[in-house]
C-alpha cells in the first residue's frame, strides 16, 4: 500500500482519460485509450529507471520541476505538439493547417507522419545508442551484470570517442541497405543530428559544473542540464509510441489521451524508484534498463527495413529489466548469506 501513493495522480488521470475517451467515441475509444496507455508504459518502463538514475542526484527543487513541468512537456509537447511539428515540416504546412489536418483528415495526417518514420528512427536511434554506449563503454565502470559482455566493453573506453565511432558506423550500416539516395541521405542527416543533440546535452552537464559518475553520466549540480537531458531522453522514447499508436487509431485526441496516461505512469514509476531507493537496493536494475535502451536503439534502426511489432519492443525491455531484477535479488541473497 505504501507504493500506491506514488500512483495517485496517475490513477486519477487514467479515470479522466477513460471518461474522455468514452465521450469522444464510446466504449471502443475508451478501450483504445487503455491499450495505448499500456503500450506506452511498457515501451517506456526502462525510461523510468534511467530517469531515476539522474533524478536521484538532483536536488528536490529540480526533481519537482521535472515531475511537474516534465509531465506537461511529455504529454502536450512530445505526444501532441512534436508529431504536429514533424507533419508541418514534411508537408510544408503552417500550424493551423496541420491541426486542421490532424482533426479532420486523420488518415492523411497519419500517412505524412509515417512517411518521416526513417528520419524519426535515425534521430531517436542515434540518441539512444549514445545513451547505451556511454553507460557501458567506460573504463572506470567496475560493476557488471553480464560480465562476459560488459567487461570487454569497458576496455573500449580507452579508445577516444568510441561511442561516437560505433554510433556513426551503425547509422552508415543501416543506411547502406535503404532504397533511394534521397532516403539514405535523410536517414544519415537525421542520425547525425541525434548524435549532435546527445553530445550537446551531455556536454551541457560538464559546462555547468557537473560531476561524472559511473557509466560516464554527467550529473549537473544545478539540475538544469539533467532536466534537459531527461526531456531529450523522453522525446527519444516517445517516438515509437507515437508512430505505433496509429496502428490502433488515427484520432489525435484519443492518441494524446492514451499516451498521456502512459506517460503519467512512467513518472509514477520514476518517483517510486527514486524515493524508495530501489536502484541502490537492486544493483543490476540500472544495467537492465540500459540494455533495454540499447535494444530499443537497435530496433529503431532495424525497424527502418522491416516492421517490428510494438508488443515485441515492450516485451524485450520488460524481459531485460525483469532478468536484471532477478539477478539483483539473487545477489542480495548471496551477499546476506555471506555477511
Map each language-model feature to its residues.
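Multi-pass alpha-helical transmembrane bundle typical of ion/small-solute transporters
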Residues: 1-339
Amino acid at each position: 500500500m505504501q507504493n500506491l501513493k506514488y500512483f495517485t495522480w496517475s490513477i486519477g488521470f487514467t479515470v479522466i482519460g477513460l471518461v474522455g475517451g468514452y465521450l469522444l467515441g464510446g466504449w471502443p475509444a475508451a478501450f483504445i485509450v487503455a491499450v495505448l496507455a499500456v503500450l506506452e508504459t511498457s515501451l517506456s518502463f526502462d525510461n523510468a529507471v534511467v530517469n531515476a538514475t539522474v533524478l536521484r542526484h538532483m536536488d528536490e527543487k529540480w526533481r519537482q520541476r521535472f515531475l511537474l513541468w516534465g509531465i506537461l512537456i511529455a504529454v502536450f509537447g512530445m505526444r501532441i505538439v512534436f508529431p504536429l511539428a514533424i507533419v508541418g515540416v514534411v508537408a510544408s504546412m503552417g500550424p493551423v493547417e496541420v491541426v486542421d489536418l490532424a482533426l479532420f483528415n486523420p488518415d492523411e495526417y497519419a500517412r505524412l507522419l509515417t512517411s518521416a518514420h526513417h528520419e524519426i528512427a535515425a534521430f531517436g536511434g542515434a540518441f539512444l545508442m549514445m545513451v547505451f554506449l556511454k553507460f557501458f563503454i567506460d573504463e572506470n565502470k567496475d560493476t557488471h551484470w553480464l560480465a562476459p559482455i560488459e567487461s570487454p566493453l569497458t576496455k573500449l573506453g580507452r579508445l577516444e570517442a568510441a561511442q561516437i565511432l560505433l554510433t556513426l558506423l551503425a547509422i552508415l550500416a543501416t543506411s547502406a541497405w535503404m532504397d533511394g539516395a534521397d532516403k539514405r541521405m535523410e536517414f544519415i542527416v537525421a542520425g547525425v543530428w541525434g548524435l549532435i543533440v546527445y553530445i550537446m546535452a551531455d556536454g551541457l552537464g560538464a559546462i555547468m559544473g557537473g560531476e561524472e559518475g559511473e557509466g560516464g553520466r554527467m550529473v549537473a549540480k544545478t539540475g538544469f542540464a539533467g532536466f534537459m537531458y531527461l526531456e531529450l531522453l523522453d522525446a527519444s522514447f516517445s517516438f515509437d509510441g507515437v508512430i505505433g499508436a496509429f496502428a490502433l487509431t488515427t484520432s489525435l485526441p484519443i492518441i494524446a489521451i492514451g499516451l498521456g496516461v502512459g506517460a503519467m505512469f512512467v513518472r509514477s514509476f520514476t518517483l517510486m524508484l527514486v524515493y524508495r531507493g530501489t536502484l541502490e537496493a537492486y544493483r543490476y536494475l540500472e544495467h537492465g534498463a540500459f540494455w533495454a535502451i540499447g535494444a530499443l536503439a537497435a530496433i529503431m534502426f532495424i525497424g527502418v527495413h522491416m516492421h517490428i511489432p510494438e508488443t515485441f519492443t515492450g516485451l524485450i525491455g520488460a524481459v531485460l529489466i525483469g532478468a536484471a531484477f532477478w539477478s539483483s535479488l539473487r545477489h542480495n541473497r548471496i551477499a546476506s548469506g555471506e555477511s
